[in-house]
Swiss-Prot record:
Domain ABC transporter: 2-204
Compartments it resides in: Cell inner membrane
Recorded catalytic activity of this chain's protein: heme b(in) + ATP + H2O = heme b(out) + ADP + phosphate + H(+)
GO cellular component terms given for this protein: plasma membrane
Role of this protein: Part of the ABC transporter complex CcmAB involved in the biogenesis of c-type cytochromes; once thought to export heme, this seems not to be the case, but its exact role is uncertain. Responsible for energy coupling to the transport system.
Recorded family membership: Belongs to the ABC transporter superfamily. CcmA exporter (TC 3.A.1.107) family.
The gene coding this protein: ccmA
Protein name per Swiss-Prot or TrEMBL: Cytochrome c biogenesis ATP-binding export protein CcmA
Gene3D superfamilies: P-loop containing nucleotide triphosphate hydrolases
Length: 205
């Protein structure tokens, strides 16, 4: 379980959010929503341990993330605005590298399946530097199909993704939470419309 208590973030003397408090349990799909500038990305970066908070605490499985950093990072998959893919490697090589550092199943079949799911079949051996920005984003998203991590934190994962791609990701997110995972995301897309699966946390007015 992820526990956020009394979280406050101030940037350039402006309070983005104050005394924010929530718990997210396994099996939950949560969307952080709010207008631009309300601190959605800041919140995700703080929760992952990449950003600084002014007050408050964050616990994962009952322990402060500062004290259980290794375990927390083993359980976490974070996709931010930067794709994190290596431009000099191909799409396939990027996913092989990802698998190697996370000690996950390194079968070529799983990699090809992941790339097919994000619409990159036939582009496996193209250097990422030659792919469009949207395709580079898809290489990063393909990691989700290879992930064994419980906690997925995704900042605008649907950027440059078409309607069919959104449906594929909706299905993936549903399966992940149905199997006891947690998904926390920001998006401007209308996902899971009227679905009881989706819980929303709103920042700002």
């Amino acid at each position: 379980m992820l526990e956020v208590s009394n979280l406050t973030a101030i940037r350039d003397e402006r309070v983005l959010f104050e005394n924010l408090q929530f718990e997210i349990k396994p099996g939950e799909l949560v969307q952080i929503e709010g207008r631009n500038g309300t601190g959605k990305t800041t919140l995700l970066r703080i929760v992952t341990g990449l950003g600084d908070r002014d007050e408050g605490s964050i616990k994962w499985k009952g322990e402060a993330i500062e004290k259980s950093r290794d375990q927390f990072h083993q359980d976490l998959l974070f996709l931010g605005h930067q794709t994190g893919v290596k431009r000099e490697l191909t799409a396939f090589e990027n996913l092989r590298f990802y698998q190697s550092i996370h000690n996950s199943d390194s079968s070529s079949e799983r990699i090809f399946h992941a790339l097919t799911q994000v619409g990159l079949a036939g582009r496996e051996d193209v250097p990422v530097a030659q792919l469009s920005a949207g395709q580079q984003r898809r290489v990063a998203l393909a990691r989700l199909w290879l992930s064994h991590q419980i906690l997925w934190i995704l900042d605008e994962p649907l950027t440059a993704i078409d309607k069919q791609g959104v449906k594929v990701l909706e299905s993936l997110f549903s399966n992940h939470v149905d199997n006891g995972g947690i998904v926390i995301l920001t998006t401007h897309q209308d996902m899971f419309a009227d679905s009881p699966k989706l819980r929303k946390i709103k920042l700002g007015d």
